[in-house]
Design a protein with these regions (language model features):
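An alpha-helical support segment within catalytic cores of ATP-dependent transferases
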Residues: 2-4, 120-182, 192
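A conserved alpha-helical element in kinase catalytic cores
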Residues: 28-81, 98-111, 222
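Conserved kinase catalytic-core helix
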Residues: 89-130
């Protein structure tokens, strides 16, 4: 039985929780993996309803600078949904480098516009204190200081670095959580060169998050456009 299930999965286009079936060039049916138990299938279904609600909200903004593929329906009793395909290809650094300067500018403008619109879908929350240490991989830094620095640095330099680490651990600042996509990476953003269409997909993780997290998300870091996205975000937000 297990072998048969494994062979079945090999024939599916699937991710960690879902598999998809294409209906022509424009539509996708999505269902939970057959390996999921009842609780996991129900959790999957709840996530799809959360996704659809977020998609419907951001589509209602109707911003022409970007595209949000429509989730057409969810059938709870059959654990399946139907949604539109996003045109184009995943927005990787390799693709971005081949685009014209105009297209690159439009992408930067589209990302910033999307971020502003997402942040404004729901009320921004109150200021919260946030430690810089929470953003850094302190375990790796600790390991380097304690176990590897002695190979290249003397005792005084190691002591100085340890003091810097300890000081950073106490730094904190105030910031506001805002409604965000929370999973912006090249796998969830597509671009169609022929139509200059920028599409955002996969809103399963949408939630309140610190504003800068989506501004400096993996997508912008990998494309090396985080600075112009930030500047454009500020300009649009302040208009």
């Amino acid at each position: 039985m297990k072998t048969a299930m494994t062979n079945e999965l090999k024939n599916l286009i699937h991710g960690r929780e879902s598999y998809i079936v294409h209906f022509g060039p424009d539509l996708i049916m999505k269902r939970p993996l057959p390996t999921l138990g009842d609780d996991a299938r129900d959790a999957w279904l709840n996530k799809q309803h959360h996704t659809k609600n977020t998609i419907d909200d951001i589509r209602a903004v109707d911003n022409p600078r970007y595209n949000i593929p429509r989730m057409i329906f969810i059938k709870d009793d059959e654990y399946q949904l139907l949604e539109e395909c996003a045109p184009g290809y995943h927005l990787t650094p390799e693709l971005f480098k081949t685009l014209s300067r105009r297209q690159q500018y439009e992408i930067i403008d589209g990302i910033a516009s999307f971020l502003v619109d997402m942040n404004e879908l729901k009320p921004v929350q109150d200021l919260q204190k946030h430690k810089i240490a929470d953003e850094l991989k302190f375990d790796k830094l600790d390991h380097f200081i304690e176990n590897k620095m002695h190979r290249w640095f003397d005792a005084d330099e190691i002591k100085q670095m340890a003091q810097i680490r300890d000081n950073i651990g106490t730094f904190e600042y105030e910031t506001r959580p805002a409604w965000s996509h929370c999973d912006l990476n090249p796998g969830n953003v597509l671009y169609d060169q022929k139509t200059s269409t920028l599409s955002f997909i996969d809103f399963a993780e949408a939630n309140y998050n610190f504003i800068y997290r989506d501004i400096f998300a993996p997508l912008q870091i990998e494309l090396n456009i985080f600075r112009p996205v930030y500047e454009t975000y500020c300009r649009i937000h302040n208009d």
